[in-house]
Swiss-Prot record:
Source organism of the structure: Coccidioides immitis (strain RS)
Keyword rRNA-binding: no
Region (Disordered): 1-73, 128-173
Family: Belongs to the Mediator complex subunit 12 family.
Protein name per Swiss-Prot or TrEMBL: Mediator of RNA polymerase II transcription subunit 12
């Protein structure tokens, strides 16, 4: 038995293989002649044997088992034949593609087999050359002048040449024994012998032979026994043979003659007679005798001749296996015992009176039960892992089971299915055992797809499970071995890894088995991935694999890192494949869109344009062209463009004179209302740094356009008076005029940038004058220079900051913050740092954040550290520092300082002073605030009772406040300082107080007490909303809270931006609340939207008593969609259903939609889609599709609009339609896909014009839509007409293919027009075949596995047969080496369509076979055999599965026995799936004449597969020999060996018998 641990087996251990001994049991024996060995020369014998050896043992039944259980043959040991080395067999020299080599490629020998025809095997042998060249001359040499004597015909053995050297004579009679017996005539040793055993031409004289009688004729002519021929045959036998062959029985007669000749040749060429051996009978023995017999069987020295007389009864099934394992019976002898037992069991079924059908069914049942016993026995041994001697037992069982399977002593199909199921369900601990058994079944498993694909999936699943476990030594070894096995499997049988259902599950696992850094491995995994991607459906929400340059620019600008380093951002934009003009236009579009928040993008664009203008780009022209093109675009906000131009003019980076010349040259300045943005820009140019003549020209053009310059001057004066009214100490110079008609702060933001710029510079000048006027100096402890101290008070700073922020001129605010950072007032410093925190993004874009932060740190270094407010300053600095990547050391230093001051102010002191701390503060005292401030700054600490007293006093005072004011803000600051002393106690007190306040009646408005607490940090938005959510989910708390819906609206009201104007002046606390609210909207917009959704659950959002939510929803939607991207459209609609109506309103505001309904609004939304508004348009489209106000008609019109949009985008090479459809409901994608499928099936197959491919291009466009929306195809089976429609379309294509092939045979190809027309038709067929293949692959769920619907199965089998016929047509045979894309590229220039096509016709044919694989996987065995039989019986030879290895791999072998027994039913059923198909297929000529021998078999290399049943002179099916009867016969003599010897070891040659 060959060891399973061969080097080729990828799952075996590295033990050295056992040596294999070859033995023969062919039943041949050598009868030697009586020639004396001394008369021959050994070298001559060896040379002759090597020259003319005919190996009679070269059969297909040699075995690798040294313990081959066969009988001994008769051997003549007197033959002295040199032990020459056996020549290799050329027929088995091909390389085995399997990674396993568990046995020789030669199948095992079967002894005692029935006789069959050896004609094909023996026909290859024969003597070449003349007989004289083969037989050496044994006569002495003659002189050169004389001719050689003729060779005697009976001289077969070579004779030794006489030596020319004289040897001394030896007296041979010396010492000779005198013969005392009478003389007896002996037959000459060299005489030829008849088959009957009599010598040729040897008749000793006895007197009764005709030669012994002397006659006149014998005396004259001699005696001879030659038969006298009546006449010479001078004529040919052809006429007489023709007469016989023309007769109706001539062929039968000729067949009989040939059969008789073959039988004679077989009988004369046999060395021994026919075997009469029968399986040994079973007898009942005692237990002792049975054990003795079994021990003798386990002993190799006991010959089987003695044991084969009888075998013990009762050894069967599980008992037989146990005995073989327990007694370690050699594998060969154990197999012999199994055969004997099986032969007796099967022979018992063949009783008299039992029909052949019942006998066959009983035999099949017995073999199946025996196989189940073997499987259960193996499983029991596997589960006994860890027991003593388990390793040796397991090794024996594996080898024994493998030998039984190879000897075909098990049910092959049942055994393979059992192994696959066991491997699939095996735990990781026993996986190496099953992998070691895999080699025995490897060839049978991977031969056909039926079991090759499940094997690939099982191995990939095991590897995926192992890789998910924690790393360990054994796990890594198993994973490496399994990876190598899978890689080898995928390389040798890639078709088994075409996984239409599980490819995306195992793709990453399979990729890990290959080394992607190697080009060869990368190519293999890429090819396998491409094959699978052609037959799988698209993933839902699949984004385009490559972004357009404009999308890449938007991503760069939206990224958070874009503000940190402008050099990186600039180089990133310039490195894109985008021309400079389009790049600047895209940046201006990003700046001016209403779908982005914040003013930082203006300063980002300003710095980029300054940099690029210095590099030579024409930025001015791009800005003017942008204003001209985007004037009427929805979502366009020109205010940001005006701000951008203002900043560029300030830095002298915009040519105002050139712009004015452009206006005059174009005649754009007209008195129109409204004013065009290109002209409106004149009203936003800053006056400073412009020459007087340019400014005068600007005024002239504005006057011509109808703009009142006096109104502009009056607005400047009014604004200055308003600011002077708010800052009388800073702006000391009075402004002429009264204070009547002053406008609100909101009016400041509506001013044009000419006024804003003028006012901003004016404020900055007065702040500088105020600083110089009240400048103080202080000693610097770090160096000798004095420190200049700013004299701005907190109130003054609050007013200046509020005015500048209303103006939106943050670059001027940065200059003012530079002056403020030198103040010694800690409140001013905290406010300045809070301003940095709120406007951090804008200051980053300006490039001033880092310098301002360093200035604030310098102010922190000189501020009074004894004030408890120092903690607030450090906290504010920390928030700013964490937004600067380069300030990590400073952040660490600030954290240490914060920890230090926390410990300083939280030190608890247990003393009489601390016991009376709470009593020393009286809330009714006018000096309450000052006393509390002194108490908190004392640093003496505070215990819990005193903290409770002070907290109660502060909370009562805060609750009494009717509205937020300076008093409530001061109380909130005291509470934050109180929290510093003991944060844990304070937080518990705060939670209790908030709960009690919410339950109080009447409940105070949240705006009265919550904004100050949030501003100082005692409460956060997240914590407060979470607390409310927990209270409302608790039944006990919910019942005690009144007006829950009103409470929710108050919570939403806290997030409204307009609240800051309602809170009054913006001081330290209010500004911090503003900052906190902005951070919550930015980072928790999703939670805020959920809060709105809960508030709108039971309340009408249009109620007049509720605050307006549209501006807040606009802000939340912008923030959410920018964070989530296009996929967030579906998320918002699905998770916030209560906000649908108000989201509609907010999107109408953002998109600028007017009062449109239905299809008109949908068309407007689709027209607004661009890179910036995509997410918002998607949400709007989904809402419109879900709303469906007009029923099915409106939905159908929307679907029709989206379908046309998709078609147009594909023609233009865009993929934006895919992003639109991926976020819409699956129902919408389903409708659009069905529309595309109907369009494909309605197109004609062949274009009317020979030079255009309109129908083919349309088909590819519609196919692209179907592919991208294929995720809408249900995986579950649903009855539809798609299968029948695809079958009809494929049949028409097959018909066109056959007609084209016939036309090409009868057409003069030398004609240019005909050749061109046929070429166009072939290309059209190729395109349509690809389109239909993709549709079939995408709709693979048309027939589910194990479907009982005969109609659906017929649709699938019909498609399967049609695809096979088209793919094997001559069209693909002729064009197999030609490129497909280069031929098709003549009718379309769309790269997206060309990329989806296969590269060559060979790849298209391969894709067709892969699609067939998807269909075959869901078919039952009966349906698969039906398709294969149809291709074999009704189609040309080139379509026979046995003639094409790829078709044979798909369909598997045809079960001939079923086709014989159910001939009538199968013939009736095969006509169903292929109606009207035969006449078209049979007319197709074969692409080649190289066909294989008919017959589909499981083992193509087995010699027994050539045996056939014959009935009435016709082959009706194969004749498989029964493996249970393949036993060797008993040896007639007793010898030293117990098995026959392979004659090939001795280099013997065939000797002809007469």
């Amino acid at each position: 038995m060959a060891s399973l641990n061969t080097p080729e087996c990828p799952v075996m251990s590295s033990r050295p293989s056992m040596s294999c001994g070859n033995s023969s049991s062919s039943g041949l024996a050598i009868q030697g002649h009586s020639q004396r060995p001394s008369q021959t020369d050994p070298s001559a014998v060896e040379q002759a044997a090597q020259d003319s050896v005919i190996d009679l043992t070269n059969s297909d039944y040699e075995t690798c088992d040294a313990n081959r259980a066969t009988k001994r043959q008769k051997l003549d040991l007197r033959i002295d034949v040199p032990n020459t080395q056996r020549a290799p067999k050329a027929r088995f020299s091909q390389a085995v593609s399997s990674p396993f080599a568990l046995q020789d490629t030669v199948p095992p020998i079967r002894t005692g087999r029935p006789f069959w025809d050896f004609g094909e095997e023996v026909s290859g042998f024969g003597f070449q050359g003349s007989l004289e060249s083969e037989i050496p001359n044994d006569e002495p040499e003659q002189p050169d002048s004389l001719p050689p004597l003729p060779v005697r015909p009976w001289r077969y053995r070579p004779q030794g040449h006489s030596s020319r050297e004289e040897t001394p004579r030896v007296n041979q009679n010396a010492g000779a024994e005198v013969q005392t017996t009478p003389f007896c005539i002996e037959v000459p040793e060299a005489a030829p012998i008849f088959d009957s055993g009599k010598p040729l031409d040897f008749y000793p004289w006895k007197g009764d032979h005709p030669e012994d009688s002397l006659t006149d004729q014998t005396a004259k002519q001699g005696y001879y026994d030659r038969v006298q021929v009546s006449q010479n045959e001078s004529n040919t036998a052809r006429p007489s043979l023709y007469v016989q062959l023309k007769h109706r029985s001539g062929l039968k007669l000729l067949s009989s003659v040939f059969t008789a000749a073959i039988d004679k040749r077989q009988s004369h060429c046999r060395v021994t007679g026919f075997s009469t051996f029968k399986p040994p009978p079973r007898v009942t023995l005692t237990d002792i005798k049975r054990e003795t017999w079994l021990r003798d069987l386990a002993n190799p020295s006991v010959p089987l001749r003695r044991l084969s007389r009888t075998i013990p009864h009762g050894i069967r099934g599980r008992i037989l296996l146990d005995q073989c394992v327990n007694k370690a019976i050699p594998i060969g002898r154990a197999v012999w015992l199994v055969k004997c037992v099986g032969a007796n069991e099967i022979r018992a079924f063949k009783r008299k009176g039992t029909s052949a059908a019942i006998t066959h069914s009983l035999e099949v049942k017995w073999v199946r039960d025996w196989s189940i016993n073997v499987h259960q026995f193996i499983e029991s041994v596997v589960t006994a892992c860890g027991t003593p001697n388990w390793a040796s037992t397991m090794s024996y069982v594996i080898r024994f089971a493998a030998r039984l399977f190879q000897e075909q002593l098990l049910d092959q199909a049942l055994c393979l299915d059992w192994f696959l199921q066991s491997l699939r369900t095996a735990p990781i601990g026993t996986l190496p055992i099953w992998l070691s058994m895999l080699g025995a079944y490897w060839t049978s498993l991977v031969r056909y797809r039926k079991r090759g694909r499940p094997l690939a999936e099982s191995l990939l699943e095991k590897l995926k499970t192992i890789l998910s476990l924690e790393d360990s030594g054994p796990k890594k070894q198993i994973a490496d071995r399994l990876s190598w096995l899978i890689k080898t499997f995928a390389e040798s049988h890639p078709a088994c890894f075409v996984l239409p259902l599980t490819w995306r599950t195992y793709k990453s696992t399979l990729t890990t088995c290959f080394c992607l850094h190697l080009s060869e491995d990368n190519r293999k995994i890429g090819a396998l991935s491409n094959r699978n991607e052609r037959i799988v459906k698209a993933e839902i929400c699949r984004q385009s694999g490559r972004q357009s340059p404009s999308q890449q620019v938007i991503c760069l600008l939206d990224s958070a890192d874009s503000l940190n380093d402008m050099e990186i951002l600039s180089s990133g934009c310039l490195n894109l494949h985008f021309d400079h003009g389009s790049l600047i236009m895209k940046i201006l579009e990003w700046v001016s869109t209403s779908f982005r928040r914040g003013s930082a993008r203006v300063y980002v664009a300003v710095r980029l344009l300054r940099k690029w203008r210095r590099a030579g780009m024409d930025t001015d022209n791009c800005i003017v062209n942008f204003l001209q093109q985007k004037a009427d675009t929805p979502g366009f906000s020109p205010a940001n463009i005006y701000h951008l131009v203002c900043e560029l003019v300030r830095s002298q980076s915009f040519a105002v004179g050139k712009y004015l010349q452009w206006l005059m040259a174009r005649g754009a300045v007209r008195n129109d209302a409204p004013m065009h943005p290109t002209v409106q820009l004149l009203a936003h140019l800053p006056r400073r740094k412009l020459p007087s003549h340019v400014w005068n020209l600007r005024n002239t053009l504005l006057t011509k356009a109808g703009f009142l310059l006096s109104s502009e001057n009056q607005q400047i004066l009014n604004t200055k008076r308003y600011i002077h009214h708010r800052l009388p100490e800073v702006i000391t110079k009075p402004i002429a005029g009264d204070n009547e008609g002053l406008f609100t702060p909101s009016d400041l933001s509506n001013l044009n940038w000419t006024i804003k710029s003028e006012i901003g510079h004016w404020i900055r000048e007065h702040v500088s004058l105020h600083r110089k006027r009240y400048l103080r100096t202080a000693p610097n402890h770090h160096n000798a220079c004095a420190i200049e101290i700013s004299a701005l008070t907190p109130a003054q700073f609050f007013e200046i900051r509020d005015i500048i922020e209303c103006l939106g001129d943050l670059s001027l605010l940065a200059d003012i913050l530079k002056h403020t950072s030198s103040s010694d007032n800690i409140i001013v410093l905290i406010s300045a740092v809070d301003t940095l925190n709120y406007c951090a993004d804008s200051f980053k874009a300006i490039g001033a954040l880092s310098d301002l932060f360093k200035s604030a740190l310098a102010g922190y270094a000189h501020v009074n550290k004894a004030d408890v407010s120092i903690i607030e300053l450090i906290s504010s600095l920390l928030e700013v520092g964490m937004k600067l990547p380069g300030e990590i050391p400073v952040v660490a230093m600030l954290r240490r300082d914060l920890s230090h001051f926390d410990k300083k102010f939280t030190g608890a002191v247990s003393s009489p002073v601390s016991d009376h701390t709470g009593e020393s503060v009286n809330i009714a005292s006018p000096a309450f605030s000052e006393g509390l401030h002194q108490l908190l700054n004392s640093g003496s600490g505070m215990d819990e009772p005193n903290m409770n007293k002070i907290f109660d006093m502060l909370s009562r005072k805060l609750k009494q406040s009717k509205e937020p004011n300076a008093s409530s803000h001061e109380i909130a600051r005291h509470l934050s300082q109180l929290r510093v002393l003991n944060s844990d106690v304070f937080d518990r007190l705060m939670v209790k107080w908030i709960i009690s306040t919410l339950k109080s009646s009447p409940r105070p408005h949240l705006l009265t007490f919550l904004p100050p607490l949030i501003g100082v940090g005692c409460v956060t938005f997240e914590a407060f909303f979470a607390l409310i959510d927990r209270l409302l989910k608790s039944d006990s708390h919910r019942q005690s809270i009144q007006d829950v819906s009103g409470l929710r609206y108050e919570m939403i009201n806290l997030l409204r931006k307009e609240i800051f104007y309602e809170l009054g002046s913006i001081d330290l606390v209010s500004y911090r609340f503003k900052t906190t609210r902005e951070e919550y909207i930015t980072h928790h917009a999703y939670d805020a939207l959920g809060l709105v959704n809960e508030a709108l659950a039971n309340v009408n959002p249009e109620s007049t008593s509720n605050p307006p939510l549209v501006p807040l929803l606009c802000e939340l939607i912008i923030q959410n969609l920018n964070a989530f991207g296009p996929e967030g459209a579906g998320r918002i609609v699905e998770e916030f259903p209560n906000c649908v109506d108000i989201i509609h309103q907010a999107l109408d505001v953002l998109l600028g939609l007017k009062a449109q309904v239905g299809v008109q609004k949908t068309q407007s939304v689709v027209g607004l889609i661009d890179d910036l508004s995509l997410s918002y348009c998607l949400v709007k489209l989904r809402l419109l599709l879900d709303a469906n106000p007009d029923g099915d008609a409106a939905r159908s019109s929307i679907v029709d609009l989206l379908f046309r949009t998709a078609e147009s985008d594909i023609r233009n090479g865009e993929r934006r339609w895919l992003e639109v459809l991926n976020v819409l409901p699956v129902s919408a994608a389903h409708l659009i896909r069905q529309r595309a499928e109907r369009e494909i099936l309605s197109l004609s197959l062949i274009s009317s014009s020979l030079t255009t491919f309109s129908s083919e291009e349309d088909a590819l466009i519609y196919l692209c839509i179907v592919e991208e929306l294929s995720y809408s195809i249900p995986d579950e089976f649903s009855p539809s007409s798609m299968g029948a429609d695809l079958g009809d379309k494929m049949f028409l294509l097959l018909q066109k293919t056959v007609e084209l092939a016939n036309a090409k045979k009868g057409t003069d190809l030398e004609s240019g027009a005909s050749s061109t027309a046929l070429g166009v038709a072939e290309l059209s067929i190729g395109v349509w075949f690809f389109v239909l293949l993709r549709l079939v692959a995408l709709h693979r769920s048309l027939v589910p596995p194990n479907c009982d619907s005969r109609t659906e199965i017929n649709h699938q089998t019909r498609l399967l047969v049609q695809i096979c016929c088209i793919s094997r047509s001559p069209l693909f045979a002729r064009r197999s080496t030609q490129s497909f894309i280069s031929s098709i590229s003549t009718f379309t220039k769309c790269d997206s369509l060309l990329r989806m096509l296969p590269s060559s016709w060979a790849n298209l044919q391969l894709q067709a076979l892969d699609v067939c694989s998807t269909l075959v996987d869901t078919l039952s065995d009966e349906a698969r055999y039906e398709c294969a039989r149809f291709l074999r019986d009704k189609c040309p030879a080139f379509l026979h599965p046995q003639n094409d290895a790829r078709l044979l791999f798909l369909f598997g072998p045809i079960i001939e026995s079923q086709s014989i027994t159910t001939h009538g039913s199968s013939r009736a059923s095969t006509s169903t799936p292929v109606t009207n198909l035969t006449q078209h297929v049979q007319s197709t000529p074969p692409p080649s004449q190289n066909t294989l021998t008919p017959g589909m078999v499981e083992e193509p290399n087995l010699f027994t597969n050539k045996l056939r049943f014959q009935q009435n002179g016709r082959i009706t099916g194969p004749y498989p020999p029964k493996p249970w009867e393949m036993l060797g016969d008993a040896a007639p003599i007793i010898g030293i060996n117990d098995t026959p010897v392979n004659l090939a070891y001795f280099g013997t040659r065939q000797s002809k018998r007469l």
